[in-house]
UniProtKB/Swiss-Prot annotation:
<keyword id="KW-0694">RNA-binding</keyword>
<comment type="similarity">
    <text>Belongs to the universal ribosomal protein uS17 family.</text>
</comment>
<dbReference type="InterPro" id="IPR000266">
    <property type="entry name" value="Ribosomal_uS17"/>
</dbReference>
<dbReference type="GO" id="GO:0022627">
    <property type="term" value="C:cytosolic small ribosomal subunit"/>
</dbReference>
<comment type="subunit">
    <text>Part of the 30S ribosomal subunit.</text>
</comment>
<keyword id="KW-0699">rRNA-binding</keyword>
<dbReference type="GO" id="GO:0006412">
    <property type="term" value="P:translation"/>
</dbReference>
<protein>
    <recommendedName>
        <fullName>Small ribosomal subunit protein uS17</fullName>
    </recommendedName>
</protein>
<dbReference type="GO" id="GO:0003735">
    <property type="term" value="F:structural constituent of ribosome"/>
</dbReference>
<dbReference type="GO" id="GO:0019843">
    <property type="term" value="F:rRNA binding"/>
</dbReference>
<keyword id="KW-0689">Ribosomal protein</keyword>
<comment type="function">
    <text>One of the primary rRNA binding proteins, it binds specifically to the 5'-end of 16S ribosomal RNA.</text>
</comment>
<dbReference type="InterPro" id="IPR019984">
    <property type="entry name" value="Ribosomal_uS17_bact/chlr"/>
</dbReference>
<dbReference type="InterPro" id="IPR012340">
    <property type="entry name" value="NA-bd_OB-fold"/>
</dbReference>
<keyword id="KW-0687">Ribonucleoprotein</keyword>
<dbReference type="Pfam" id="PF00366">
    <property type="entry name" value="Ribosomal_S17"/>
</dbReference>
Amino acid sequence: MMNDHNERKPLRTIKGRVISNKMQKTVTVLVERQIKHALYGKYIKRSTKLHAHDADDLCNEGDVVLMTEVAPISKTKNWRVVEIVARSD
């Protein structure tokens, strides 16, 4: 019989744009997604602001970053910046 308790779920990763890096070791990331309207079928943009842990303060405003979900670090922060995909100009 297989023991499924040792297998971990794949970590959730999302991509977003840094809109604020004014806090120490924390960045605010805007994550945009498209949803389909139930009745009319038009695709609508929706966005969410998330706080992510940036231990080395490497991110700047406008950077596109890849984040992964982690155990809660603070009241509002449960994401960690994994890599900077694209730098802002």
